Amino acid sequence: MATETYAVDAEDVVKQFGKQRALDGVTLRVRRGEVYGLLGPNGAGKTTLIRSLVGLVAPEAGTVSVLGHRMPQLEVLAHVGYMTQQAALYPDLSAEENVHFFGAIYGRVDGVRDALELVDLWDRRKSVVASLSGGMRTRCSLACALVHKPDLLLLDEPTVGVDPQLRVQLWDRFRKMAAEGTTIVVSSHVMDEAERCDRLGLIRFGKLLAEGSVAEIKAKAGVDRLEEAFLKLSEVSPA
């Protein structure tokens, strides 16, 4: 792919569902090799924004470019990994078969073992997904998103149901991937995870209220804790 400055370049994106404006003029630019966190409560617009980046949601207004290409564009998806909030897996297949399926789509079945080992599922690779716990299904879904070693990784609440020890391991891996050039956009409402990001975007009512490093956001709000900064900076009406 080309080497543009931004892996994600979305401008003035608007998305309406009936009378509800899920995205209200969002502009988002994420540099290559950056870990960017979307922080906000449920219903803030995080999932809709991520789905618009991958081309699953068509905005009413605005533009979305990913890896230098205007979305939606099928060829770009070969370079994008996307993990949904709810595991999109085949319940009657094993964990290994699920990851192999997604690897085959991208012609990267050689990455199956690495992906399963990363999420600590190699020992359970023969287990049918329907028999796995919710946390294990989350990990399997993440392995499917990682199997083809994407240039851009879009993660919607990737550590829900994951135990604290594995959460730390996953974030260590995310940081290593970013150091190797992978761009990661991750949504979360967990403050300690937000602290691991290079930059954050605080989102509520479909608006991107503030952006910057954790230190910059705290300074902008004039507080010492990220939770307090989010509460102070999100004191806006939905109108």
Positions of predicted regions on the chain:
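Helix-to-loop junction immediately C-terminal to a conserved catalytic motif
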Residues: V54
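Conserved ABC transporter NBD signature motif
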Residues: G62-V76
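Conserved ABC ATPase "signature" region
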Residues: H100, A104-R124
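Catalytic Walker B motif of ABC-type/P-loop ATPase nucleotide-binding domains
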Residues: L153-E157
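ABC ATPase "signature
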Residues: E211-G212
